[in-house]
Amino acid sequence: MSQTTDRLWGARFKSGPSAALAALSRCPERYFRLTPYDLAGSKAHAGELQRAGLLDEQETRTMIEALDGIGADFAAGRIAPTLDDEDVHTFIERLLTERLGALGGKLRAGRSRNDQTANDLRLFLRDHVRTLAVEVLALQTALVDQAEQHVESICPGFTHLQQAQPIVFAHHLLAHAQSMLRDVQRLMDWDARTSLSPLGAAAMAGSAIARQPQQSAKEMGYAGVCENSIDAVASRDHVAEFLFIASMLGINISRLAEEFCLWSSRQFRWVDLDDAYATGSSIMPQKKNPDIAELARGKAGRLIGNLTGLLSTLKSLPLSYNRDLSEDKNGVLDSVDTLLLVLPAMAGMVATMTVNVEELRRQAPLGFTLATEVADWLAVRGVPFKEAHEITGALVQACEKHDLELWEASPALLAEIDPRLTADVRDSLTLEAAIAARSGWGGTAPQQVREQIGRLKTALAAQQQWTENYQGFRL
């Protein structure tokens, strides 16, 4: 083959590309991770060529066997792209023609790199959103397992990072699990929207050969085919949406990680990290650092950067395909890899932590966290809440002045603040009473928390089933 036609696009050129163009144009090494997905699309396209009459049954069988052989050799590390392989598609066509001769060159008919690359990334993402979901479910399971052990472990709840009201520790852990439940729901919703094959769009106008791509779409596990050939090759909103979901997941992980940095500090002393999930200092022998939490917190910014990078690339691109779109894979591969590093480490840290229940309880009433109980006690006895709030504020001021806790206020002090404050109010000023009072749906009362755990387990089981019931291509 001549120098001008080594590449898939070289036929109309009198000379090959400059070294600078070749270096810029060649896809990064990491993009060749899409090879198995390109092979899956190629096998489906071979069937479409047979249906179109360009391949007979034996040729199709030979083609698919060769593609399977390339896949096996690639997975085993027996073959690798060369510097002359401009991209995944060139790499596979070179190997196919080396093994099959002229027959290998037939596979290109009826398709373009434009619909191929769009298909490769969709297949990669549909596979990996399930892998990611499994890891998120493992982290959620660790949170739920810890929550089950601490349904009655009372701790302070916070607003503005100030102690606010007593809650059970399980309730706090489950709040993180609930946010991640939505992360997986977003992956599931995304997958339903993305389950459309772009094959058959060819360069942008549609294929004059592969005119019935519904069967190949079904073989690849898609629910259907993209409605518009231009949209199929030009749009990457599904990629940006995935990167948003990855960013939101990273942010939710980062919030949990931030709390572990606080909880494991000497100032909080809420949790002790297992030695296998903490590090030390090169100069301070006493240190036990929450590096997993800190690294997870830091990588959230990386995930957000991948999203904003792609959004900036997509801005103002005219229809249809533009080479700018080749940047779509950078953020995807990095975000997937980042999350697959962070999630197992976070799950292990959560699963192995030791909770200091006594310290949680000691801190629970500090900062007058039971003050709302006084206001509620007055309100249910007919005092307008505006007045109840003011009366309770005056009681807090008096207790601060006399260095008392709320439940230590004498009947005389209570009456001095307001005659409607009788000694009976002190029955409400226990941690157990405050917790038990929050017995409405979604509240922190232990029975409500147990019911929440049951519902959450049911939801997690359904999400786990979704990860397993996939008919598309998976590595």
From Swiss-Prot:
The keyword Heme does not apply. Belongs to the lyase 1 family. Argininosuccinate lyase subfamily. Keywords: Amino-acid biosynthesis, Arginine biosynthesis, Cytoplasm, Lyase. It is found in: Cytoplasm. One of its GO terms (cellular component) is cytosol. Gene3D superfamilies: Fumarase/aspartase (C-terminal domain), Fumarase/aspartase (Central domain), Fumarase/aspartase (N-terminal domain). Its main location: cytoplasm. It is an enzyme of class 4 (lyase). Its EC number is 4.3.2.1. This is Argininosuccinate lyase 1. Pathway: Amino-acid biosynthesis; L-arginine biosynthesis; L-arginine from L-ornithine and carbamoyl phosphate: step 3/3. The gene is argH1. Transmembrane segments: none annotated. It holds the Pfam family Lyase_1. NCBIfam families: argH. It catalyses: 2-(N(omega)-L-arginino)succinate = fumarate + L-arginine. GO terms for biological process: arginine biosynthetic process via ornithine; L-arginine biosynthetic process. It comes from the Bacteria. InterPro entries: Arg_succ_lyase_C, Argininosuccinate_lyase, Fumarase/histidase_N, Fumarate_lyase_CS, Fumarate_lyase_fam, Fumarate_lyase_N, L-Aspartase-like. The keyword Cytoplasm applies.
